[in-house]
Amino acid sequence: AQLDRRTCTLTKGAEGLRRLVVGLGKKCILAQTLWGLCQSFQEGQERTLAFCWLYALALVLALYFDFSGYTDMALGVGKLLGFDLAENFRWPLAARTLTDFWRRWHITLGWWFRDHLYRPLVRAAGGKRTGCLLLVWLLVGLWHGAGWNFLLWGLLFGLLLAAERLGLGGWLNRFPPLGHLFVLAVLGFGAVLLTGEDLGQSLALWGGLLGQGEP
């Protein structure tokens, strides 16, 4: 439909160029620098609690700047061509609950899974939302890759999102700073799973995050 309605204006072109430059900066400067730091960690031997958490949070930031950088570039090119594409990231790292995070991160993918899988499953299951939520998140994990790491990643987020629906979310909203720390911590565990070579390596790093690494 936008093919018939697209408009190319100086204002839209300037905004498109700005988004393109921002995306390039995120991808080529911030993300690449952070990936380099993560690679240095992997090649080193230190596995202290603080170092493992710095690594996990660097992974989170690297994934964010990498992915949102590509999205910004796509939005920028779209505007240069006269198209208005949907925003895909809305400050996700500022979220105070995981539910809010997933409303801000990779928004269009979330819409697709919600409309084409979750809602039809809930209707078919007679409104049993929790089981459907867990199943969809296992499928989201497999969408990211076929392996135990990705299944565990999906299970992790599915269980915690279900817990937020059952009361955890209300508690996190009452204590925003703790909610924010909770989100960042879970993202750290999740990032280790997404980027690990195999489940054994990821679980070893989880041990480091829980203080079970080398002193």
Language-model regions: role of each:
Residues 1-214:
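Membrane-embedded transmembrane alpha-helical bundles that form the catalytic cores
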